[in-house]
Regions:
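Short, low-complexity N-terminal intrinsically disordered segments enriched in polar/charged residues
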Residues: 1-36, 146-148
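Hydrophobic pocket/interface hotspot
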Residues: 16, 33, 41, 94, ...
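Short beta-strand segments enriched in hydrophobic/aromatic residues
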Residues: 20, 37, 98-100, 131-133
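Surface-exposed, charged secondary-structure patches
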Residues: 42-43, 47-105
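A short, polar/proline- and glycine-enriched secondary-structure boundary/capping micro-motif
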Residues: 54-57, 105-108, 136-144
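Short, surface-exposed coil-to-beta transition loops
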Residues: 78-81, 109-115
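Short beta-strand edge/turn micro-motifs at domain boundaries
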Residues: 111-139
Length: 148
């Protein structure tokens, strides 16, 4: 195992959030993030940039090209606030609830859900796809109280 970020689902999710978070003008950890994603991984916002419905489907390079200008110019910290995880054999599906903030502790920008599909190849975990959507009028995060 050469990538400590890929040893567990927890380490993958933590590294994913850490890699895109930072202050305006701070370089993001794109290569760290790339190393979490399978070479054929897809990243899919469930809403268009205009806010309307419809998926934009990106490979990793397309995702970086679409997000880097905003992240380079803005303080942006994405923090996991809850999770639902389902595993079967070498596959896992994680619903990761997040807050995006302008500072690590404040300045709430938005909240949403990342639907992350992962696979263990016998040596490490890979992100195969991530689809996400944000809260908006008429759509709120579900209750995050842990279920028994």
């Amino acid at each position: 195992m050469s990538n400590p970020d890929a040893v567990s689902i927890d380490s993958v999710i933590q590294a994913m959030y850490e890699s895109i978070s930072g202050g305006a003008g701070e370089p993001r950890q794109w290569e760290r993030d790339r190393a979490l994603h399978h070479p054929k991984a897809l990243l899919v916002p469930a809403r268009q940039a205009s806010g309307g419905p419809g998926a934009g489907v990106f490979d990793f390079d397309g995702f970086v090209a679409s997000r880097a200008p905003y992240l380079d110019a803005n303080d942006f910290y994405e923090i996991e606030i809850g999770r639902r995880e389902f595993r079967f054999g070498a596959i896992a599906h994680v619903l990761s609830f997040y807050e995006a903030r302008s500072t690590p502790e404040g300045g709430l920008l938005r909240r949403g859900v990342n639907s992350i599909q992962l696979m263990h190849d016998g040596e490490r975990w890979w992100i195969l796809s991530t689809v996400w959507d944000n809260e908006r009028e008429g759509l709120s995060l579900p209750d995050l109280t842990p279920s028994n």
